[in-house]
Each structure stands twice: as structure tokens, then as C-alpha cells.
């Protein structure tokens, strides 16, 4: 019986710390995606808001279902490592590489990312339709909004 009480006490002490550690990335983030020009394909940089909640990343750019849309999702491990998945719709052949890269076509790729407390970086894997250039990601945690002055 004494062993059970000790285990219960230890669980109460250590569980809050464990959950805090896995949610340390939670908050609003700014995501910057940069794909350099290569060959006849133009480069581009997109910035869009993202959120991490319960150590799950979610970011969206554009209108769902429309050319230029991009959604990024995935879990973040306690050490900050993440394998995120991007799904999008080609905006213009001018900015996309590959045989199937035509306006309105869907694409997807994986992102290998590493998060710190307030910053993160990532690189795009080779995805169908947009192969052949390295795209990079920068993640910056945003400060929480200041509460309004109470009067």
C-alpha cells in the first residue's frame, strides 16, 4: 500500500512537468517558406500565420481548394524534431517544377523541421511535381498579445 502511495505522489509531481515539456512550443508562429529560382522556374517567398497547439503544428496560406493554397500539419516531438506534411494546389506553372506541375494540380511533400523555444527551421523533401530545388522554412514564435488596459 505504501508503494502505491509513493507511486501516486511521484506521478502527481512529475506528470505536470512532462506535459509542460511537450507543449513548450504551443502558441502562434509566423512561417516563412522560401523556394529559390531554378532553371525556368521562378523563386518565391511566402509568409503566413501558423499555430502550434498541444504540440501539433498547423499552418495555412491562401483559400482552401484554390490555386496557391498550402496547408502544413504534423506533430512536434518533445525534443523539437518534426516531420510535417505539406499539401497544396499549384498557383502557376511559372513557380512550380515537374511534369505534373500545372495550375490547379494538387501536390504534397514532407518537411523535416527542428523547433527551439521561439524559432525553428525546416527543409522540403522531394515531392512529386515540384522536385529539383531545395525550399527552406523559418518558423518564428510570435509574442502573445498584450492584454488591454483595464479601466
Placement of each model-derived feature along the sequence:
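Short, linear, compositionally biased motifs with a strong N-terminal bias
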Residues: 10-13
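Central antiparallel beta-sheet cores of small beta-barrel/beta-sandwich binding domains
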Residues: 23-115, 121-150
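Bacterial N-terminal signal peptides that target proteins for export
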Residues: 1-8
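N-terminal signal peptide c-region/cleavage motif recognized by signal peptidases
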Residues: 16-17
